Amino acid sequence: MDLYEYQARDLFEKHGVPVLRGIVAETPEQASEAAAKLGTPVVAVKAQVKVGGRGKAGGVKIAKSAAEAAERAEAILGMDIKGHTVHKVMVAEGADIAEEYYFSILLDRGERRYLAMCSREGGMDIETLAKERPEALAKVPVDPIDGVDDAKAREILSEAGFPDSEQDAIVPAVLKLWETYRDEDATLVEVNPMIKTGDGRILAIDGKMTVDNNASFRQPDHAGLVDRATTDPLELRAGELGLNYVKLDGNVGVIGNGAGLVMSTLDCVAYAGENFPGSPAPANFLDIGGGASAEIMANGLDLIMSDEQVRSVFVNVFGGITACDQVALGIKGALEKLGDKAVKPLVVRLDGNAVAEGRKILEEFNYPLVTMVSTMDEAASKAAELASKEA
């Protein structure tokens, strides 16, 4: 889960990373009050969106009074930045910037380890720096067990070209950023820029964080980081049900077991949809996972059926750990529960473990909206056809 800047700032502060004061505002009036409360000659009014490039888009503005902060907030709130609407701003105190650095720790999935990146040239787009001047960006592997101690922090800074005389001031911030990364089960902690002020202080003034949703069982506080106001209601409900669900823009609901199979199913539906009026496309990604019970299947189908955008549903299950009879029981249970509310046609393709039992359950159930299809391509085509008729 990507966090907003203000959320990252709060977690940094929690772990002792030196940060500037910042107050979140949702209206120009609140921004004015925040600027007055901070009481600094200059404040930055910063759009809170989970995407880069907000500065170039006009999403970061300087204000020199409370009234000016309100004007800046009014201009920023409601902006569209790369498809993200700005609903909040953070009013942050200004800083006397002498130097700007870059620092991050991330999960390097390819190498199966952590990676620390550091540069003396912060404040600019890091992708551009890495492409145009790769020698200016140090990349140092971090062992997940050993982590970052004083010696490792100095190694990272040395690789980035910081002389020994400058490292003493920066090492404490690096250690606290590592602590944040480790203790919050993050997959990314990034500060750009980390600054040195005119009086020699080191501050993290713009941070990004991504936390691992798979660690939510030991990070109960992370539930409070979910922005319910901007998250799709179906995704919120799916999370409460423990379902791996992503909302898409099409009208064919998709349910499968295993991320690979579901992604292949999305492709099949999109390809098949090109042959029908309106070009039906996938409405969602929903992986019920391995060993799914009838209850999980029923919850998934109930969720998809509640999506007003969905015109047909394609259930594609290859039984391994997941038994096809449990899937069939889940379909039956969901349709019985929905009763007259179940008005969307289902195309079901079952294969593998307990397929005969699963097909028998659905055949005996004999529900008029359920169509059994034997192959994936035929099922995708049928689901797209039904969606085009229902549109």
UniProtKB/Swiss-Prot annotation:
Record protein name field: Succinate--CoA ligase [ADP-forming] subunit beta
- HAMAP family, alphabetically? Succ_CoA_beta
This protein's UniProt keywords: ATP-binding, Ligase, Magnesium, Metal-binding, Nucleotide-binding, Tricarboxylic acid cycle
Involved pathway(s): Carbohydrate metabolism; tricarboxylic acid cycle; succinate from succinyl-CoA (ligase route): step 1/1
Q: What GO terms in the biological process aspect are recorded for it? A: succinyl-CoA metabolic process; tricarboxylic acid cycle
Q: What does this protein do?
A: Succinyl-CoA synthetase functions in the citric acid cycle (TCA), coupling the hydrolysis of succinyl-CoA to the synthesis of either ATP or GTP and thus represents the only step of substrate-level phosphorylation in the TCA. The beta subunit provides nucleotide specificity of the enzyme and binds the substrate succinate, while the binding sites for coenzyme A and phosphate are found in the alpha subunit.
Look up and give the organism this protein is from: Cutibacterium acnes (strain DSM 16379 / KPA171202)
Catalytic reaction list: succinate + ATP + CoA = succinyl-CoA + ADP + phosphate; GTP + succinate + CoA = succinyl-CoA + GDP + phosphate
Question: What do the Gene Ontology cellular component annotations say?
Answer: cytosol; succinate-CoA ligase complex
Cofactor(s) needed: Mg(2+)
Matching entries from InterPro entries are given as: ATP-grasp (IPR011761), ATP-grasp_succ-CoA_synth-type (IPR013650), ATP_grasp_subdomain_1 (IPR013815), Succ-CoA_synthase_bsu_CS (IPR017866), SUCC_ACL_C (IPR005811), Succ_CoA_ligase-like_bsu (IPR005809), Succinyl-CoA_synth-like (IPR016102)
The family this protein is said to belong to: Belongs to the succinate/malate CoA ligase beta subunit family.
- Please tell me where ATP binds in this chain: K46, G53, R54, G55, A95, E100
Q: Which GO terms describe its molecular function?
A: ATP binding; magnesium ion binding; succinate-CoA ligase (ADP-forming) activity; succinate-CoA ligase (GDP-forming) activity
Q: Which domain of life is it from?
A: Bacteria
Give, as one word, the top-level EC class. Answer: ligase
Chain residues that bind Mg(2+): N192, D206
Which residues make up the binding site for substrate? N257, G320, I321, T322
Record's cofactor remark = Binds 1 Mg(2+) ion per subunit.
